[in-house]
Amino acid sequence: MAIRDTLLPFSHSKTLWEVSSVATVFGIYSFLPIWKDHSPYADIADLPSGLHAALSVVVGWLLVFRTNTAYARWWEARTLWGALVNASRNAAVKLTRLVKLPNEERQQVKMLLSYFPFALRDHLRNEGNLDDMPEIKNESQIKHIPSIIIARLYERVSLWKSSGWIDGDELRVIDTELAKFLDICGACERIQRTPIVRSYRYFTRQCVMLLLLTFPWGISNDFGWWTVPLTMLTAYFMVGLETVAEHVEEPFGRDEDDLDLDGLCHTIENSVQQIISTEATT
């Protein structure tokens, strides 16, 4: 049952079908050197096996570096969103525990903290949406909604200070917590706006294609009809690594390999609402 539950989602994976299609094309292509070996041209233009082995090593190192670089971006993004979960919980606790707020102020804090992750998600996807934020919906030419939300929180904190609800020490504690939100936002923007160098991506793809085009010609003499499945298997893994790297290097989208930002947003929303609601009853 566990194996079936693991394989079923994979079998419906978009990446799987993309890679399998490419592997099938190279499998069909690998019939050419087999045909040549059984034709009058069998001794013409044989590819030295040593050349192919050297090319395999080079492409292997390129793919390792390519995959590691892409995954490092994905993992950094996941770490930042994990930090956002913690920052939201800490802010909810300190904003409601350090200050005895009226219910209206609590609702404002809850609304702003709950909406920040959704605003950041949409901002990283270039999908600004103000429908759930009536306070800022009417402001014109808003380009950075996460900053506006934090600015609204600072306006509330400034009001609390001028009203005597918090002192200077409490203000510094709250400022430290709120500053984390825009730090995380800026780090996410750095990942989003600094893609892997396009020339490097193209160069890696060209090397993979060159290797796969020469692979069956280098092994057909030794493996005969086994050249077809070996070529398909090699193409599957090499193209698969390149495809996975391409998908995970942009972690904020909607693909199946991207971060589950919707789930993380709802986790933060539920945590903030639970913390503030609990504080209100104590």
Where are these regions (language model features)?
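Juxtamembrane "helix exit" motif at the C-terminal ends of alpha-helical transmembrane segments
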Residues: G27-I44, V208-M238, E242
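Membrane-spanning helices that line or support transport/gating and their immediate boundary helices
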Residues: A70-W74, A83, K94, G240-P251
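Acidic, Ser/Thr-rich low-complexity segments on the non-lumenal side of membrane proteins
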Residues: W75-H123, T267-T282
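Cytosolic/matrix-facing juxtamembrane and C-terminal tails of multi-pass cellular membrane proteins
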Residues: A235, V244-T282
